[in-house]
Regions:
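C-terminal lid/capping helical subdomain adjacent to the catalytic/cofactor pocket in oxidative enzymes
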Residues: 59, 118, 178-179, 307-348
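Glycine-rich FAD pyrophosphate-binding loop
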Residues: 1
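Surface-exposed helix-capping loop/turn segments at secondary-structure junctions
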Residues: 74-86, 163-167, 194, 214, ...
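Short, conserved active-site loop motifs that form the nucleotide-linked donor/cofactor pocket
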Residues: 165-167, 255, 319
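Active-site substrate-recognition segment that forms the wall
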Residues: 4-48, 175-178, 182, 191-317
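Mid-domain beta-loop-alpha active-site segment that forms a flexible
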Residues: 144-159, 203-204, 274-281, 336
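Rossmann-like flavin
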Residues: 38-156
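A conserved short coil-to-beta-strand element within the FAD-binding core of flavoproteins
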Residues: 119-130, 167-184
Length: 348
């Protein structure tokens, strides 16, 4: 939904980085053994955190996000989604700290024409009565949707892909070469040659693009989630607590608590402190909850300007890229595929 067009490369976020790193309940963490590898990325992030660069990212993300739901609807017309997607909007709330950041986000969305409803404490309580009374105000985005079970939706789309003649091979790519400009993918014991190929491996894409001598500043924002089973009745829609950078979504599996940004690369182990942070934040929002389950770590592929990489390689005309969608990979999947396939087919 277009509400998500406000990027993280902002002057206010840049100024808050030191305090966020020092806060145990804050939205940002760093694996210190990974700091040397992150320095080039951080320097580029600083350069992209001016007001001008922020608005450049916001305007471009708004354009593609505006097309995201229609692209999903094209696919959803062909599968049975009963009970798997809900159209109840999304609610952002905050306390009385960092109000300037919230005002900036609202201002940017107003400039982009995003429909948003400012809500006071009484209206927040009417929308979500189980949230503890710690909040100052919020914004409600009525047209946002959320998935009750993303895995079930993905499997339905995968079945549709196979029915339409798609083929799937799960193999480790060891190297990419070229035969008369056609990409040749090498696995441990096989080779595959294609007219054109798309690298769409999320945060793992850099391992392949480096082999093609394209130094794309892709890294990963490590994100976490936990589930609280049989608690989905406590919320009607996703709720994001902006100050601490986490959200809670009611799903088939219960309440899914997601959030935080941890810089630490692909190989560092899961941080128990981040899991504890999510559990603590969930209880701060909703009070007593049962024992959590399903601790999970995922990798958000992010670039310093928070724009995705979509389009042909600069070095090889038959290689296309589609990665770097940071927090919006699920949201932007269908429209990104449509855009890149249009490029490959030489469509407008």
């Amino acid at each position: 939904s277009p509400y998500a067009s406000v990027p993280l490369n902002r002057p206010d976020v840049l100024g808050d980085v030191p305090s966020m790193l020092m806060s145990s309940s804050g939205p940002l963490a760093l694996k210190w053994n990974y700091l040397p590898k992150m320095i080039p990325w951080f320097l580029k992030f600083i350069m992209n955190s001016t007001t001008k660069k922020m608005m450049h990212t916001a305007k471009n993300m708004h354009q593609i996000l505006d097309l995201a739901l229609p692209a999903y609807d094209e696919l959803f017309d062909e599968i049975d989604l009963e009970g798997l997607v809900e159209n109840k909007g999304i609610l952002y709330i905050w306390n009385d700290q960092d109000l300037k950041s919230r005002e900036l986000e609202i201002k940017i969305r107003d400039e982009l024409g995003v429909e948003q409803q400012l809500v006071n404490k009484a209206e927040i309580h009417d929308l979500e009565p189980h949230i503890k009374n710690f909040y100052h105000a919020g914004v409600f985005y009525p047209y946002a949707r959320h998935a009750r079970n993303p895995k079930k939706i993905l499997l339905k789309l995968f079945d549709l892909f196979l029915k339409k003649g798609g083929k799937f091979n799960k193999l480790n790519i060891k190297d990419i070469n070229f035969d008369n400009e056609k990409p040749l993918f090498k696995t441990e014991n096989q080779s595959f040659i294609f007219d054109k190929a798309v690298i769409a491996c999320g945060a793992f894409s850099k391992k392949l693009t480096d082999n093609l001598d394209e130094k794309i500043p892709l890294d990963t924002e490590r994100g976490y989630h936990v589930h609280f089973k049989n608690c989905d009745h406590l919320l009607s829609r996703p709720v994001i607590f902006s100050n601490r950078g986490f959200g809670i979504t009611p799903m088939e599996q219960g309440l899914r608590v997601v959030g935080t940004v941890e810089f630490g690369g692909l190989n560092n182990p899961l941080s128990k402190s981040r899991i504890k942070n999510l559990i603590s934040n969930a209880k701060y929002m909703l009070g007593d909850l049962p024992e959590h389950e399903d601790e999970w770590l995922g990798f958000r592929p992010s670039l310093p300007d928070f724009l995705p990489v979509m389009g042909p390689s600069k070095n090889y005309k038959n290689i296309f890229y589609c990665f770097g969608h940071h927090h919006l990979g699920w949201t932007l999947g269908p429209i990104s595929g449509k855009i890149v396939s249009g490029m490959i087919a030489n469509e407008n």
